[in-house]
Amino acid sequence: MKIIILLGFLGATLSAPLIPQRLMSASNSNELLLNLNNGQLLPLRLQGPLNSWIPPFSGVLQQQQQAQIPGLAQFSLSALDQFAGLFPNQIPFPGQASFAQGAQAGQVDPSQAQTPPQTQPGPNHVMPYVFSFKMPQEQGQMFEYYPVYVLLPWEQPQQTVPRSPPQTRQQQYEEQIPFYDQFGYIPQLAEPAIPGGQQQLAFDPQLGTAPEIAVMSTGEEIPYLQKEVINFRRDSAGVLMPSTSPKPSTTNVFTSAIDRTITAKFPEEKAKTDGLREP
């Protein structure tokens, strides 16, 4: 058992390189490269333009030498620490302007990148979708905002309601009285008066009622006359039929078709047959 443990330690010591070597991949792509130098783990190194955005490990005193890439701004470690506390949409990217400042497109200088952009609230200022809960400037001031869909009383559009012409007490009383028919409740509304001295004739084909003609003079007012209901339909029939049609009689339908001479012979023949049957 001890031999196996010793062989394990020996293999672990032989596998660790004594000379710092740079591990390269076969495809030479943008992969993480690890260096071992006297048992100390150096910060990660990335081959590509994202080399400046990788923060170093904590506790490392040695700074990694980075190659200067033309066209990209190099940021210091203090600038990266300041960017970590900003909003996601307020981090300035190299080659384009910050979203919060709204400036024209251009490259960001290292001196400007070290100071975080300060936004001042204005009328057209758009709040970011991620915001902190503690705002030192506006912590003591709490405002109540109305939703967008709420309209104030003085902003609501005024709706004009058409007013009906004034009616007399007699007409209002007649409109409230219901009219009961065999079909159920049918409200009767008063017909509007036509200026000119005569009222409009209204014939209801469903009810079969014809109102009276109310003649009104221009100088005096005649109260509205109650309708006189004239029934043009039969109570037993479901179809409207005029009352002037002759009523069919069903009393002599069967008597006229039977011959009375035949009916008189039946009792005589019956009496003869009864007499023959008797012994």
UniProtKB/Swiss-Prot annotation:
Region (Interaction with ARHGEF5): 127-129
Chief site of localization: secreted
Annotated spans, Disordered: 100-125
Subcellular location(s) per record: Secreted; Cytoplasm; Nucleus
Highest taxon above the source species: Eukaryota
Keywords: Biomineralization, Cytoplasm, Glycoprotein, Nucleus, Secreted, Signal
GO cellular component: cell periphery; cytoplasm; cytosol; extracellular space; mitotic spindle; nucleoplasm; nucleus; supramolecular fiber
Glycosylation sites: 115, 119, 168, 244, 250-251, 255, 273
Segments of skewed composition (Low complexity): 100-123
One Pfam match: ODAM
GO BP: any one term: regulation of actin cytoskeleton organization
Entry comment on modification after translation: O-glycosylated.
Signal peptide: 1-15
Quaternary context: Interacts (via C-terminus) with ARHGEF5.
Recorded family membership: Belongs to the ODAM family.
Chain's role: Tooth-associated epithelia protein that probably plays a role in odontogenesis, the complex process that results in the initiation and generation of the tooth. May be incorporated in the enamel matrix at the end of mineralization process. Involved in the induction of RHOA activity via interaction with ARHGEF and expression of downstream factors such as ROCK. Plays a role in attachment of the junctional epithelium to the tooth surface.
Protein name from the UniProt record: Odontogenic ameloblast-associated protein
Organism: Macaca mulatta (Rhesus macaque)
Gene encoding the protein: ODAM
